[in-house]
Amino acid sequence: MATKIELIKELRKTTQASMMDCKKALEQNNDDLEKAIKWLRENGIVKSAKKLGKVAADGCIVLHSDHHKAVMVEINSQTDFVARSQELTDFAQLMISEVFKKATPTTTIEEVTQYELQGKEKVAERLALVASKTDEKIVLRRLMVFESKTNHIFSYLHANKRIGVILEVEGKFDEQDGKHLAMHIAANSPQFIDQDNVDQTWLANETSIIKSQAKLEVQDNPKKAAFLDKTIAGRVNKLLIDICLVNQKYLVDESKTVGQFLKEKNSKVIHFVRFEVGEGIVKEAVDFASEVSAQMKK
């Protein structure tokens, strides 16, 4: 038999209601899960069960930073219209302000949902209210916190609020240098700082794919086959240039690489993180006729 805590977890997973609402719903219905779900719907806490199955793949990035701390959160909604709505914008600003005050590099996104906004309602409760008003599934997807007493923290939020970057730099970097490098990361999407930081399992997998592709290309051409190893090495090297920050041509001055620019400044990138709304989420495809039909049946 499930414990009270397990029932609350299951109810939260099913309905996305707050922990306190789930606890109350179960208490009002003798720990009957189905009745608790019905109670939450009847009381307007969960507006629609159908909403829970939808994919929140749109949204916005919100961040707050100073020279020694930066916090960044991805908020997902189902449409860009809601992502740009005043309701979500107001919530995002309140939430990120509290996150900046309280969060540390080890804070989880689940912990953020329990923060109180201006000493009143919790983040999860306000989030549920915004979801109810906009009639969309809205979730806090991920969080990143950088904090340093000795190094400089920089950030960049693109104008569309769909791409955000935070980075930590050691050395003589001023505000403009930091902003430009953060903009470069936003535009060029590096995955690693340099080759020493490249995930070796990932690289081995990519190298294997490159080898297979190259072998197929030369299988009927003995002359090209003689240069197979050089071809593979060249493509792996190009891949490393593309994905490593220090190897990329610097966005502000393409006559030099990012690595050369950092060397001129006697500086070093310690960490960087780039968030882009919806990356890694498979957005559900609904044809127009089906969408209209679904709306008419509501």
Swiss-Prot record:
GN (gene name): tsf
InterPro entries the record matches: EF-Ts_dimer_sf, Transl_elong_EFTs/EF1B, Transl_elong_EFTs/EF1B_dimer, Transl_elong_Ts_CS, UBA-like_sf
Entry's localization field: Cytoplasm
Official protein name in the record: Elongation factor Ts
HAMAP family for this protein: EF_Ts (MF_00050)
The keyword Protein biosynthesis belongs to this UniProt entry's keyword annotation: yes
GO CC terms of this entry: cytoplasm
Region (Involved in Mg(2+) ion dislocation from EF-Tu): 79-82
Entry's family note: Belongs to the EF-Ts family.
Function: Associates with the EF-Tu.GDP complex and induces the exchange of GDP to GTP. It remains bound to the aminoacyl-tRNA.EF-Tu.GTP complex up to the GTP hydrolysis stage on the ribosome.
Superkingdom, taxonomy of origin: Bacteria
Gene3D superfamilies: 1.10.286.20, DNA helicase RuvA subunit, C-terminal domain, Elongation factor Ts, dimerisation domain
UniProt keyword terms in alphabetical order: Cytoplasm, Elongation factor, Protein biosynthesis
